[in-house]
Structure formats: C-alpha cells, structure tokens
Amino acid sequence: MTNQHSAPLTYRDAGVDIDAGDALVDRIKPLAARTMRPGVLAGIGGFGALFEVPKKFREPVLVSGTDGVGTKLRLAFDWNRHDTVGIDLVAMSVNDILVQGAEPLYFLDYFACGKLSVDTAAAVVGGIARGCELAGCALIGGETAEMPGMYPDGEYDLAGFAVGAVDKSAIIDGKSIQPGDVVLGLASSGAHSNGYSLVRKILERAGARPDQDFHGQPLVDVVMAPTRIYVKQVLAALDRHGPAIKGLAHITGGGLLDNVPRILQPGMAAQLQRDGWEMPKLFQWLQQQGSVADAEMHRVFNCGIGMVLVVAADQADAVAATLREQGEIVNRIGEIVPQQDGMAQTVVV
C-alpha cells in the first residue's frame, strides 16, 4: 500500500546507488582478469567462484588466511592515498599462509562503505589486483557493500581472504628447529600494516605533513609504502632448499618479540643481534619523535624485518644467496639457542 501524499522512493533515495556499483564492477573486471592463473574455472560475476587445485600437488592441504589493513586506513582517508592499501590487504593474508609453505592460489576481498565512490573503490581494487599479481594468486571474487549511515562519507573498511595449498609432506611447522639454526631476516618496505595507531599518534605529536620531505621523499610515500609481498621469492627458496628452511614467521602485529615465538617449540629461543641489521630511517624517526623505548619498538613494529626464516646452519649462506637472487635484502640476524629459565622465547641483545 503506497502513501498517496508522498513521492515514490527509490533505493538511491535511501543512499544505495546500484548504477555506481555496476560501474565499479565494469572497472574491476579488467583488473581481475590480469590476475587469472591456471585453475580458475569461474571468477567474478557468478554467485560463487570456482577453482581447481593444481595437479602438481600430490597430497594437497588447503591453507587459508584473512586479515585487514587496520588503522593505516585512517591515514589513507586523511592523506587521500588509496592506491596502495589494496596491496597491503593482499600482503597481510598471503604472507601469513606462506609461512606454512603454502602457495597462494586465490584471493577474495570485501569493501564496505557508506557512500560508494567509484574512483576511490577502483583505486583500492587496483591495488588489490596488483598485490595478487605480485603473489601469483587470482583475484577470484569479492563483495562491495554500500551501507548508508554505517560509515562517514569518504571512509571504508577492507577485509581480505587468501587460500593456498601445500603438499602435506612439505608443511612448515617449525618442529625441526633446533639450537644452532640460523635466523635470517628479510627487509621490510616500511611499517607494513601494523602499529599505525602509534604511527598516527607520533605523526600528530610531530605535526607532520604528508608532503614534507623525508630523506628525499614525500613523507606520505614512506609512511604509506605498501607491505612487501614475499611469496614468489620465498617459494623459489623453498623449491631449491626444501627442508633446510625449518620455520617462517611473518612479522606483523606484536613485532619480532611476539611473532618469532609462534614457530618455536618449548625450550627453544631466538637470540637476535641488535646490530644484525640496520633499523630503517622511518623507524629511527618514529622512535625519536615518540620517545619510544627499544622494547616497545620491537613489540609494535617490524623494525625493518618483515619476514623471518629459521634455516639449518650449514645451508644458511645458500638460502640467503637464493633469496638475494630473487631481489630480497637478507640479513643474518640471530640464532636459535636453548631457552634458559626466565628467558623469553625471542630476545634482542
């Protein structure tokens, strides 16, 4: 029954623009097409995406991961930088499943906003597609949710979902790690996607501007640098060195102190050398401007190390050489030692 005294309402009147959503899908399809890989049977456009596990996996185990970008999005809104957070979104999930030896196969995203800006959303999804290309996985589906009243104009939230596969016999679980094994660290590209609540607090205290010079670069480029994706490089090392790589840790929230212990068995500890790598200028500046203690830095930020590998001592040089061939900056940052009474499982000395 209609109200004869009121104009008819449409979905657009309620704040949902179906035409804008359709326009975004048209923008997304060619971006997703660039990420396609063998195994994709049906991608964007259907009710569900279909993927056939590659036959090279003899006894495949599926590995899944999901994550977001956290409060780094607040800076994306404030500084109008939307083309890199999509890479962050992919990186957070694919790097997580990589540590168990999995090859990422496909990725799905969720983009939620109050009012859909096609240009902003397309910039974000363009970053997601680029991240998928870097990881070698297909952007196989996603959801764009325009929800009036749920988010302020110009703001959005992101979630990502990655699925990969590893042969059951090749799962990396850290169980073979023993004292004497070497800890290698792969350089990060910046703060990645963690610790940004503290980053923002420090930027506010310092009165920082996105366009101010930071060692020859605009500060926005340094602070918003996308999370490095380690997938192809580490998979190449796994293909060549296999069991010599005993453990992998993605250095995310909790920094080195909380993430390295996740791959260690009871009674083992990682002793990291403070001078084993140079802390990048961004972290030095953040620490100085925020008067942040060393222990807090190591527990909040990656401090320049985005991925850790624990490798057999007699293969450490060979593994490092392979990773350098793949374009990684590799440092020998410590070793595995027996855990003494009262000793944390990761210490920086």
Curated annotation (Swiss-Prot):
GO terms for cellular component: cytosol. Gene3D superfamilies: PurM-like C-terminal domain (3.90.650.10), PurM-like, N-terminal domain (3.30.1330.10). It catalyses: 2-formamido-N(1)-(5-O-phospho-beta-D-ribosyl)acetamidine + ATP = 5-amino-1-(5-phospho-beta-D-ribosyl)imidazole + ADP + phosphate + H(+). The keyword ATP-binding applies. Pfam families: AIRS (PF00586), AIRS_C (PF02769). One of its GO terms (molecular function) is phosphoribosylamine-glycine ligase activity. Pathway: Purine metabolism; IMP biosynthesis via de novo pathway; 5-amino-1-(5-phospho-D-ribosyl)imidazole from N(2)-formyl-N(1)-(5-phospho-D-ribosyl)glycinamide: step 2/2. SUPFAM superfamilies: PurM C-terminal domain-like, PurM N-terminal domain-like. Keywords: ATP-binding, Cytoplasm, Ligase, Nucleotide-binding, Purine biosynthesis. It is found in: Cytoplasm. It is an enzyme of class 6 (ligase). Its EC number is 6.3.3.1. Its main location: cytoplasm. GO terms for biological process: 'de novo' IMP biosynthetic process; adenine biosynthetic process. Belongs to the AIR synthase family. This is Phosphoribosylformylglycinamidine cyclo-ligase. The lineage of its organism: Bacteria, Pseudomonadati, Pseudomonadota, Betaproteobacteria, Burkholderiales. The gene is purM.
